[in-house]
Amino acid sequence: MKFTPAKPPLTGETLESLTARLRERGEPAFRASQILDWVYKKRARSWDGMTNLPKPLRTWLDDTFDLMPATLVLNKQSADVTDKLLLELRDGSLIETVIIRAPQEGVGQDHSRKTICISTQVGCAMGCVFCASGLAGLKRDLSAGEIVAQLLQVCYREDALTPRAHMELASFDNIVVMGMGEPLANYDALIRALTILNADWGLGFGARRITVSTSGLVPKILQLADEPLGFRLAISLHGATDEVREKIMPVNKAFPLAKLLPAVKAFSEKHGRMITLEFILIDGVNDSLEQAEKLRDIALDLHAHVNLIPYNTVEGLAWKRPSITRQERFADVLRARRVSVTLRREKGHDIDAACGQLRLKTEKERQVLAAAKT
């Protein structure tokens, strides 16, 4: 499921591929570095802004490439300073990118830790019953250029807040590939995008600060382990037994815990880095003390960090988050055995921040407006 645009996005080109295209038209190799410097370091918003390029070359670039394949159509900020960016692609598809700010321990309310969460697909085919992203199914994969464009749009937004100087992407602490879609189901585009994100000629963001999340595609986890850049891994677990996990995550039928956990352990041992286990707490589904004990045992075996996430309500779904008391009781089971655990507090609960929810809400509003015009 791919979209073929009239012009490919420049944000999907590597230094090598762009150099090859330029050489085909007789341009010197250094032009590729100049162009990418304009895109990622100087953040030119138009071809005419690339003033050290000859005009014929700028005309060719305009005819050949799409400089920015994503347009910001909505920016919602929550009371806890979580920003959700809704982006429109060339075919009208909508995707979400989230900026999460949180205070560091010991520095009060200075929101100094910043994370960007990016999407890899329009919709999702995994069918997790609690998730807004997959309610309308999978529409298509994102191209590498569309994935990278999300980071540039974040840069544009941050630049606008500090107009005296360009914001460095390195000022963000982490980039997590945990937005709409299953990242490892769009593997080739993902790796190309992360290569561009990491490269010195690209956005220059360290691989150790990039986390790829998956619902559990075992063959792709093992493939990711062989990637030379060494990205971090997070597993969307959400159930500590097959019985619970299969009820809410269909992927568990193909890759049950007996297959998933050894693959995760192999990844961890190869890279020597702590894995993160993502666990959305859903009232009456996976928030029992028995689930907490099973999760504790899994985390201890994998030497993993556990990220507990109270469920963000999704319109049209009956699931809800447990009480704060129940959340703390669950976390205490892990803490008692010194499992590294984070219990996430409000992060965008007031701005449709459940993954994919803002997109669905906007699409419904567009459909209503379109129907009203007919």
From Swiss-Prot:
[4Fe-4S] cluster binds at C124, C128, C131. Belongs to the radical SAM superfamily. RlmN family. CDD domains: Radical_SAM. The lineage of its organism: Bacteria, Pseudomonadati, Verrucomicrobiota, Opitutia, Opitutales. This is Probable dual-specificity RNA methyltransferase RlmN 3. The keyword Disulfide bond applies. Its cofactor is [4Fe-4S] cluster. InterPro entries: Aldolase_TIM, Methyltransferase_A, RlmN_N, RNA_MTrfase_RlmN, rRNA_lsu_MTrfase_RlmN/Cfr, rSAM. Residues 110-350 form the Radical SAM core domain. Its main location: cytoplasm. S-adenosyl-L-methionine binds at G181, E182, S213, S236, L237, H238, N312. The active site is at E96 (proton acceptor), C355 (s-methylcysteine intermediate).
